[in-house]
Amino acid sequence: MNTEPVNKCGLKREDFQTTVQGKKTDLFVLRNNQGNEVAVTNYGGAVVAIMMPDKDGNYANLVQGHDNIQDVINSPEPFLSVLIGRYGNRIKEGKFTLHGKEYQLACNNGKNHLHGGPTGFHAHVWDATRMSDNAVVLKYTSPYGEEGFSGELTVWVAYTLTDDNEFVIKYQATTNKMTICNLTHHAFFSIQGIANPTPTIDNIICQVNADYYLPIDETSIPTGEILKVEGTPFDFRTPKPIGQDINADDEQIKNGSGYDHNYVLNKKEEGELSFAARIKDPVSCRTMEVYTTEPGLQMYTGNFLADFKGQHGATFPRRSAVCFEAQKFPDTPNHPYFPSCRLCPGETYTQKTIYKFGVEK
């Protein structure tokens, strides 16, 4: 058994090796020619470390995660930096109609369905194939009826760390029966470093390339409206600190307990890979840019993080991380004018999302 620690984040492969659901789990460390690293496990596709330098060359882990497989499996935050499917985000009351048939999904977020259900893609061991030093491909076949979904869905996800410090996630999925498909990744980013003694994201400078967003009701389900961000706390078209308006006296901020809303990304054409968002830590000068082919981007500011211990004893309190979940829109099956999430036999679902890291002094 390989016990060699990861050079920069100190994780040990043996701490991620066990058997779950009859399948073996493991740790895969992706490295580029700069010596930077992304560490992932095939349990739920969890990203457990992203090691990048600051303006002085000092390294820190920029994603919240755990340092052993049992803590990943039993995390107080089940969606901590994992793959999400079959349906990312919420579906109202877990109900939708497809081709004249009504489906009832598991409801695990009050009366609503969230992120594929309690045993969604985050809670399964994926088959893993190491492609190179900087790439791994994960595969999972979701059987017919899993969490109430129709059709058998086969999913491939490729993780790659490029020499330009881009963490690239490519998704593909096929089905044998008409179904819905909305995949995403729920990485909790702390570009200030997860071990920072004051881990708040309030001072992180954020930009989101969206003129519109989806308002939500008190259960976080879209109302069906598509509203302008102009003149609201949701206007990040010009960079501003995340904390500037996060506690504003605003109904939408109150409904989300902060930011937990889908942005309608500005696109010249459907499916183009384009700039979605950017954050910068003014202290370390680290930056992260998000590019995606998806029409929507859920910005979630860790409003419900439960102040638990994570990797190497780091504490993950409320609003210590921000998520940028590239996706179709929430509750799309119940809003026919939202971008379609339907997938039919013979079609291939595809998505590409890039998280690009850098330093800007």
Question: Whereabouts are the PLM-identified features?
Answer:
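An exposed, glycine/acidic-rich loop-and-rim segment of catalytic or binding clefts
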Residues: 2-361
